[in-house]
Amino acid sequence: MTAYRLTRRASLGLAAVPLLLPLARPARAQRLDRLVFQTDWRAQAEHGGYYQAVAAGLYRKAGIECEIRQGGPSLNIGQLLLTGRVDMTMSNSFEAFTYVREDAPFFTIGSIFQKDPQVLIGHPDTGFDGFEDLKGRTLLIGSGGRVTYWPYLRKKFGLRDEQLRPYTFNMAPFLADRNVVQQGFISSEPYSISKAIGRMPPYLLIADAGFSAYQTTIAISRKLAVEKRDLIQRFVDATLEGWAQYLKGGPATEAANALIKKANPEQTDDRIEYAIKVMNERGIVVSGDALQGGIGAMTDARWQGFYQSMVDVDVLPRGLDVARAYTLDFVNKGIGKPT
């Protein structure tokens, strides 16, 4: 795992393990193009559009047999892509630039999340209302966050490295000290903490500070994108339609959630319902570029702006060819655009 990877597993200091989601073959003899997509963590609502595309038959309608492999705490997803064991992975802006820096033959073809879903969570009734209120508090941030969004927040809000403490992947240190702020994901940790303290804690969405990373992106080899352009376009279109249906509660959403719960029994109906609700309310998927280009949209300007913001805080090196990190060929076609 590279220093610049910022996904759920990286923020926890973990890698990923492939857990296969078996998909039934169609009853009729039908030749389908097979693709393997690797997610960055265990099955959850934050991956719901992919499971919706399976449950609603969108991939099969597009002539694709899509195998979804869920992530977990063991293998390096980037290595799976590098060795050709998977066709595409769930990724992010940081990893795209890491591929450029290391001259690896991979790039980004779409971004499901317009807003990075990471949050900093405080305690109720402690004056924790904005990023300026981070000053003077103990911050539990993992290794991934320390080399990605932390330098950005530190510079913008005058914070200090002395405030940092290790994130131990459980709520106990946070619950024990009301002056502590901990990292999390908007669709998960605030919900878990609310169950422990009896009310929803205040939290700050890092994207609201101007941190403009694309998140939950689709990474692929340049070779596959060029040689099988039609196949990849069909995959992208079916995936984006899956996300549009999932967020609105399409007819196959219950079946999609059943697939999620089967793959990851830790997921419950109420947790999934909360995650979908907060993704919609906070515009995690449909906001920014997606308001005009549809779900998955990206722009040259945002890629360039994010890169420059990371250069300014010494997170990424100067001189990278930003255009090699991504292509706009497969997105910005209006799928899932608000009407």
Predicted feature descriptions by range:
Residues 58-61, 157-159, 196-198, 266-269, ...:
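Short helix-capping segments at alpha-helix termini
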Residues 159-164, 203, 264-280, 316-324:
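Short, surface-exposed acidic
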Residues 2-18:
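N-terminal secretory signal peptides and thylakoid transit peptides that target proteins
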Residues 226-313:
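Secondary-structure end/capping motifs
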Residues 24-26:
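N-terminal signal peptide c-region/cleavage motif recognized by signal peptidases
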Residues 29-187, 205-206, 212:
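Short, glycine-/small- and polar/acidic-enriched structural segments
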Residues 300-339:
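Conserved C-terminal helix/tail region of periplasmic/extracytoplasmic solute-binding proteins
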Residues 94-95, 169-266:
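Pocket-lining segment of extracytoplasmic ligand-binding domains
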